Amino acid sequence: MEELDFSSKTTTSRLKLFGFSVDGEEDFSDQSVKTNLSSVSPERGEFPAGSSGRSGGGVRSRGGGGGGGERKYECQYCCREFGNSQALGGHQNAHKKERQQLKRAQLQATRNAAANFSNAGSASQFLRNPIVSAFAPPPHLLSSSAVPQPMGGPWMYLPRVSPSQLHVSHGCVIQDGSGGAGAGGFSYEYGARDSGFGVVGAQMRHVQAHGPRPSVNGFSREVGTTFDDGLGLDLHLSLAPAGH
């Protein structure tokens, strides 16, 4: 009996190497089958017995969990979609460069406008009235002391004629150079006479500061002839031919 028990114990004992039994051919073949089943790809749906299939569920959520299958990256400037983050980053960098160039151009334009405004500040009063600015000199070029004062000279060239022989034709105003330049001015008296031409002639009185006030009393034939002879002109109307 003891020999039989010993033989049964020796036959039932197994030798294991790294957790695998190497004594029985049947056990070794079963273990190899299990390892082959565990190495099969989970995408084909072949999972070993007792496995929960977690790896297959991750692939489904990545591949078609939401129905699209691909993640989109949208640009915050133009709302354009890209397939990866690298393409989106390069696209947004281009947007940033364009915005920097635009800001630089705006700053340069603002500086130029400020410089032009400061340079034209002295002439701003002439910009309100362009007609005045065309004829009036700038105030900073000529001071009040440097502006020449108007001289009381004759307004037109006349031959030497005595003050009593002044003749005014066609309402012209003539200032005598012999009179005082600081006179109070001129006073005019217009009157109409009976003729076919309506208003005929005018009377002018030259006011002087000192001395008598000579006046022109109408149009006399003698004074008019003397004045016209001095200029070499004949301004009298006549129906007779010239020279008579």
From Swiss-Prot:
Coiled coil: none annotated. The keyword Protein biosynthesis does not apply. Gene3D superfamilies: Classic Zinc Finger. GO terms for cellular component: nucleus. Its main location: nucleus. It comes from the Eukaryota. Keywords: Cytokinin signaling pathway, Developmental protein, Differentiation, Gibberellin signaling pathway, Metal-binding, Nucleus, Transcription, Transcription regulation, Zinc, Zinc-finger. Residues 30-41 have a biased composition (Polar residues). Residues 26-69 are annotated as: Disordered. A zinc finger (C2H2-type) spans 73-95. GO terms for biological process: cytokinin-activated signaling pathway; gibberellic acid mediated signaling pathway; glucosinolate metabolic process; regulation of DNA-templated transcription; trichome morphogenesis. One of its GO terms (molecular function) is zinc ion binding. InterPro entries: GIS3/ZFP5/ZFP6, Znf_C2H2_sf, Znf_C2H2_type. It is found in: Nucleus. Residues 53-68 have a biased composition (Gly residues). Probable transcription factor required for the initiation of inflorescence trichomes in response to gibberellin and cytokinin. Acts upstream of GIS, GIS2, ZFP8, and the trichome initiation factors GL1 and GL3. Binds the promoter region of GIS and GIS2, which may be direct targets of GIS3. Plants over-expressing GIS3 have increased trichome densities in sepals, cauline leaves, lateral branches, main inflorescence stems, and have ectopic trichomes on carpels. This is Zinc finger protein GIS3. It comes from Arabidopsis thaliana. The gene is GIS3.
